[in-house]
Design a protein with these regions (language model features):
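N-terminal domain-start signal
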Residues: 1-321
Length: 321
């Protein structure tokens, strides 16, 4: 019998009432200034009420998410798909620092297992076998690649692909349909983003194939060939897949495409609003909160940089509730 999470879901249902709706986001966009936006967030209970800095408020909201997960006493395996990108960020930083010294990675995430400082130590000492299994091969390849070619971009794609492969594997292993679907969407959307960037920068088909991670909803061989062939061919291939809406967004603008990518993932988790017993609603809530924070960051950045409301509106993400 599948594990049930009746108490945890009941708690999440009460917290969902505090999530920003599309209407709340519109109200935030409508405030006049950046300072007004900060006050709006504080009135909604964001931060501790003491911060006047956007980064401090958003960091505090992120901390609240993981404090809640800890409070609900849920196994970490259910959130691997969300924590893996932080782990591989740490690996990327550690590899570059081990070869070229201080790099533009001012932050190692320490709230991961293993921690950022531990990954840094293992890579520095070339103790790759002590890294998590999915990292070992990527760490070796990335170090060797950077050492012999000095190509930081090649180092990045080796680690980014390994991260996506780990996300796909974790999604299947978690035993939850929402986590599996989220992982699949995450990998596919990342592959599409990679293909789009590669097409725009004229990368070779071999480079594109090396950068893409296998997933069930895309044929990455066809995706790579389409990206190499050109923008029209790439949109044509996507129009044949479950990501056909992405082809339309891609034709509109880069910001429309980025927005579509995030909205696609939110739509994947929306059915969890009607689940009552599985881990799904808890995971969906965490994803929804992360999306909410990202959207607020976009709005605050727009206010700070004097963008029009319409320009900000084009960039905001769809909300979960």
């Amino acid at each position: 019998m599948a594990e049930q999470f009746v108490y945890q879901v009941a708690r999440i249902r009460s917290l969902e009432l505090q999530l920003f709706s599309d209407q709340t986001v519109e109200q935030l966009i409508a405030v006049q200034t950046y300072d007004d936006a900060i006050r709006f967030l504080q009135e909604k209970g964001w931060g501790t009420g003491q911060e006047n800095d956007a980064d401090a408020i958003l960091d505090r909201e992120n901390e609240k998410i993981w404090a809640l997960v800890k409070e609900l006493n849920i196994e970490g395996k259910y959130f691997d798909v969300l924590s893996l990108p932080k782990q591989y960020h740490n690996l990327k930083a550690a590899v570059k620092e081990s070869i070229v010294g201080e790099v533009d990675f001012p932050l190692y995430y320490e709230d991961t297992e293993p921690s950022g400082s531990k990954i840094k130590e293992l890579v520095r000492d070339k103790e790759y076998d002590k890294l998590p299994e999915g990292m070992r091969k990527a760490a070796r390849e990335a170090v060797e690649s950077l050492l012999h070619t000095g190509d930081g971009q090649l180092c990045d794609i080796i680690i980014d692909r390994a991260c996506l492969e780990a996300v796909e594997k974790a999604g299947k292993k978690a035993g939850s349909s929402v986590i599996r679907d989220y992982a699949e969407s995450t990998v596919a959307v990342a592959d599409i983003k990679t293909a789009v960037r590669a097409q725009k920068t004229g990368k070779s088909v071999d480079f594109i194939k090396r950068a893409l991670a296998e997933c069930e909803t895309l044929d990455i061989q066809r995706l790579a060939k389409a990206a190499f062939a050109g923008a029209e061919e790439l949109r044509s291939y996507l129009s044949e897949t479950v990501y056909s809406d992405g082809a339309n967004a891609l034709a509109q603008s880069p910001s429309a495409f980025e927005r579509w990518c995030d909205n696609r993932i939110i739509r994947t988790i929306k059915p969890q609003k009607y689940e009552s017993f599985t881990i799904g609603p808890v995971v969906a809530y965490v994803i929804a909160r992360l999306n909410e924070i990202k959207t607020v960051r976009i709005i605050l950045s727009g206010k700070l940089n004097g963008l029009t409301d319409e320009s900000i509106r084009e960039r905001v993400r769809e909300m979960y509730v």
